[in-house]
């Protein structure tokens, strides 16, 4: 087998929360709502450019989840542009952010949480100034 790279990740939640997640990932993270195949269940596909990177799938109320689902995931990272504008937008929305960096690379990282508490990293490679 040859691994060709990352395809997407999927978050499952009840419909009321799924709409909040959609709004967060579109309005805060900057993904775009795009086409989704006509599955029997409701959901959204969010895109970064032409690539679907996040699938939001409706979970039935009380749907059982594997115990390991909540215990091992730390965060997902997105490569971004526009650090200053992003920091201003996050501050204006009152979103808690932890700013960090990758030593020796010049990469700036902004860590935040989505409405379900999942970790999100916004990664910027551009020089500051």
What are these regions (language model features)?
Residues 53, 59-61:
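Short, conserved turn/kink motifs that form compact alpha/beta structural patches or helix kinks used as
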Residues 39-43, 72, 104-108:
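Short acidic/glycine-enriched loop/turn segments that link adjacent beta-strands
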Residues 11-53:
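Core segments of cupin and vicinal oxygen chelate
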Residues 1-4, 92-129:
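Vicinal oxygen chelate
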Residues 69-90:
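Mid-chain, well-packed structural core segment of small domains
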Residues 1-22, 74-76, 128-129:
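N-terminal beta-strand motif that seeds the catalytic metal site of vicinal oxygen chelate
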Residues 23, 89-93:
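Short amphipathic alpha-helices in soluble, non-transmembrane regions
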Residues 12, 77-81, 113:
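Short hydrophobic/aromatic beta-strand micro-patches
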């Amino acid at each position: 087998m040859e691994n060709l790279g990352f395809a997407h990740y999927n978050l499952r939640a009840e419909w009321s929360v799924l709409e909040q997640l959609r709004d967060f990932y579109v309005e805060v993270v900057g993904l775009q709502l795009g086409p989704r195949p006509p599955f029997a269940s409701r959901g959204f596909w969010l895109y970064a450019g032409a690539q679907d990177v996040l699938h939001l799938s409706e979970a039935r109320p009380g749907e059982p989840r594997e115990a390991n689902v909540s215990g091992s995931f730390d965060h997902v990272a997105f490569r971004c542009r526009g650090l200053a504008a992003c920091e201003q937008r996050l501050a204006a929305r009152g979103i808690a952010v932890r700013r960090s960096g990758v030593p020796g690379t010049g990469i700036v990282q902004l860590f935040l949480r989505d409405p379900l508490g999942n970790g999100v990293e916004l990664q910027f490679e551009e020089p500051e100034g």
